[in-house]
Regions:
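Short, conserved alpha-helix in the C-lobe of eukaryotic-like protein kinase catalytic domains
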Residues: 131-141
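Activation-segment/catalytic-loop signature of the eukaryotic protein kinase fold
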Residues: 14
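Conserved catalytic-loop aspartate of Hanks-type protein kinases
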Residues: 128
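Conserved activation segment of eukaryotic-like protein kinases, specifically the C-terminal portion
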Residues: 102-116
């Protein structure tokens, strides 16, 4: 709620109700990437520009002390107005806790969540990089990585982003 980051709409309030916490964010009159993907895939350049903007947003989150890990990067949680992306839905975001062996709660969206989000290890900024790699693939193909192969530089970048072992991934979004 305290962050002022371009690409993250302001959070007006966080309210507790019978279902848990409800986050009230600014309304944006644009579509989610999921809605856009119902109509078409993105060109290599468009996909790159979207991923680049998300890297900038995530870099700011990951530079906080403690680091903020979104943990639910997927087309439904990203709005796009044709120029700017907006990252929403921080319901399962968490602060990184140093020296913790694994997360106590298994959360994330199937297909996009990193393997460590299913209780194997602690999530960290590389978990967001994994999800970002899946998203990059989906923007280009409209399919999850296991369903379709890419070629060229995009394939090499995405393969590194979605490595099963976090040590095999890019270690931060600046890479």
């Amino acid at each position: 709620k305290q962050l002022d980051i371009e690409g993250i709409p302001p959070i007006y309030s966080i309210e507790e109700n019978e279902d848990g916490l409800e986050i009230i964010e600014e309304y944006l009159a644009c579509q989610t990437l999921s809605d856009i993907l119902d109509e078409h895939t993105f060109s290599n350049l468009e996909a790159y520009q979207i991923i680049r903007q998300l890297c900038i947003i995530l870099d700011v989150l990951h530079q906080q002390d403690p680091q903020i890990i979104h943990r639910d990067i997927k087309p439904e949680n990203i709005f796009y107005d044709g120029k700017q992306v907006y990252l929403f839905d921080f319901d399962i975001a968490r602060n990184y806790i140093e020296n913790q062996k694994r997360d106590t709660t298994v959360l994330g969206s199937q297909g996009y969540a990193a393997p460590e989000q299913f209780g194997f290890y602690q999530t960290d900024i590389r978990s967001d990089i994994y999800s970002l790699g899946v998203l990059y693939h989906v923007l280009l193909t409209n399919k999850l990585p296991r369903d379709y192969d890419l070629q060229g530089i995009e394939k090499r970048i995405i393969d590194k982003m979605i490595a099963i072992d976090p040590q095999g991934r890019y270690q931060d979004v600046k890479e």
